[in-house]
């Protein structure tokens, strides 16, 4: 039993040692691979990381000045000093949240148009000599070298960076098209007709005069544009018609209009049946207008838990003017819209704001008297004339009263 235990222990120890050896080998290989990757990155980015601008920092920079800005894990990048007003509000708020404002400078990276706030220690001026030094010694990537070249071109031409960028990235095909001169249409030479025995010529369908006219009338670009404009002008409807057409239309329109009849009860009964629909339509419109006036007055002056304000009184004044000048009030409209019952309540109101200015109480009472002339008991027949009610109209109340016969 002791021998078996020792053998099993030996096996376990061997397995543990083998596992340790495998782990050490993996660590060694991993370190080697990481070292080789780092060496490759250093070879690629060696020039970028080693490059430091030769210019000295300044205390302040002008807006629009070209600089070299440095962010963590990035090389020195060409940029431009931006003012806070030129940056959009959303971008400005995001920058203030993500970057520190202490001794920070607003910078716009070129040509990506990205903004950032960078400390003044990581911002250096970009001069023409420094940019030429970058290009001559190949101290950055091709992308940065191209932007530096555009900056030099903008400084020489005294133009903004965006204008130079547009000229640089303009396709060559468009330039070639612009450089090519416009070719003029060539005139075709008309050859003479062949001769036949006897001195006769072949008779063409078109004579020489017609051929010369067609050659002269050959369309050019300008003539085609003018022709298209004239065709469109002829096809499009003219905004101002001729005076003859307008005169005809006016006469025709005037003849088609029908005069509205007078809205008295006797006149309505004398009319033929064909006009009943027209009367009903007009009556419906008048009913809706008076009903709207009633709702407005009731909401302002008689609504629950609402005391009328001075700002509402001008609107009340306008509604009363509309009712006073309404020329077609009759008993049916007063009963259906319940306007008469509303004014019986309005007369009882007191302490109306701006009553001295608009004289509401007296106007309510006068309108109520006018409405009483139209309202009759159901037993009596309607003999009241529906004359128009004006603001200064005098209503004969005696006509509304029934005649009493004394014996």
Swiss-Prot record:
Subcellular location: Nucleus
Entry keyword set: Chromatin regulator, DNA damage, Nucleus, Phosphoprotein
Superkingdom of source: Eukaryota
SMART domains assigned to the protein according to its UniProt record, in alphabetical order: PWWP (SM00293)
Region (Disordered): 1-46, 163-248
GO biological process: chromatin remodeling; DNA damage response
Residues annotated with Phosphoserine modification: 160, 162, 236, 238, 242
GO molecular function annotations of the record: methylated histone binding
InterPro entries tied to this protein: PWWP_dom
Pfam families, alphabetized: PWWP (PF00855)
Domain PWWP: 63-129
Keyword DNA damage assigned: yes
Entry's Gene Ontology cellular component terms: NuA3 histone acetyltransferase complex; nucleus
Biased composition annotated in UniProt, kind: Basic and acidic residues: 172-208
Entry function: Component of the mst2 complex which is a highly specific H3 lysine 14 (H3K14) acetyltransferase that functions together with gcn5 to regulate global levels of H3K14 acetylation (H3K14ac), critical for DNA damage checkpoint activation.
Subunit structure: Component of the mst2 complex composed of at least eaf6, mst2, nto1, pdp3, ptf1, ptf2 and tfg3.
Record's protein name: PWWP domain-containing protein 3
Gene: pdp3
């Amino acid at each position: 039993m002791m021998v078996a235990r020792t053998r099993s222990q030996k096996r376990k120890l061997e397995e543990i040692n083998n596992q340790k050896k495998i782990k050490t080998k993996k660590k060694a290989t991993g370190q080697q691979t990481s070292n080789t990757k780092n060496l490759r990155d250093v070879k690629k980015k060696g020039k970028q990381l080693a490059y430091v601008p030769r210019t000295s920092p300044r205390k302040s920079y002008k807006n629009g000045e070209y600089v070299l800005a440095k962010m963590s894990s990035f090389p020195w990048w060409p940029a431009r000093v931006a003012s806070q007003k030129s940056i959009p509000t959303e971008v400005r708020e995001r920058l203030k949240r993500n970057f520190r404002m202490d001794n920070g400078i607003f910078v716009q990276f070129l040509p990506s148009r990205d903004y950032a706030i960078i400390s003044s220690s990581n911002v250096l001026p970009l001069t023409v000599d420094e940019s030429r030094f970058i290009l001559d010694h190949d101290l950055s990537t091709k992308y940065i070298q191209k932007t530096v070249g555009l900056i030099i071109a903008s400084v020489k031409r005294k133009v903004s960076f965006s204008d130079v960028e547009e000229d640089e990235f303009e396709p060559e095909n468009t330039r070639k098209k612009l450089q090519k001169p416009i070719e003029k249409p060539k005139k075709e030479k008309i050859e003479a007709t062949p001769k036949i025995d006897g001195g006769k010529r072949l008779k063409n369908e078109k004579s020489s005069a017609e051929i010369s006219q067609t050659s002269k009338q050959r369309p050019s670009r300008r003539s085609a544009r003018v022709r298209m404009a004239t065709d469109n002008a002829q096809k499009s409807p003219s905004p101002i018609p001729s005076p003859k057409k307008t005169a005809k239309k006016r006469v025709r329109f005037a003849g088609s209009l029908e005069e509205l009849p007078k809205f008295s009860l006797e006149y309505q009964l004398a009319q033929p049946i064909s006009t009943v629909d027209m009367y009903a339509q007009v009556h419906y419109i008048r009913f809706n207008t008076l009903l709207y006036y009633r709702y407005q007055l009731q909401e302002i002056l008689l609504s629950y838990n609402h005391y009328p304000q001075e700002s509402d009184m001008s609107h009340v004044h306008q509604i009363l003017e509309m009712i006073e000048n309404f020329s077609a009030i009759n008993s049916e409209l007063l009963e259906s819209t319940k306007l008469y019952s509303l004014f019986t309540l309005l007369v009882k109101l007191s302490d109306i704001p701006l009553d001295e200015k608009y004289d509401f109480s007296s106007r309510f009472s006068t309108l109520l008297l006018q409405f009483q002339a139209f309202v009759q008991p159901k037993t009596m027949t309607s003999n009241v004339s529906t004359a128009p009610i004006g603001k200064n109209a005098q209503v004969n109340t005696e006509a509304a009263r029934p005649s009493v016969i004394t014996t």
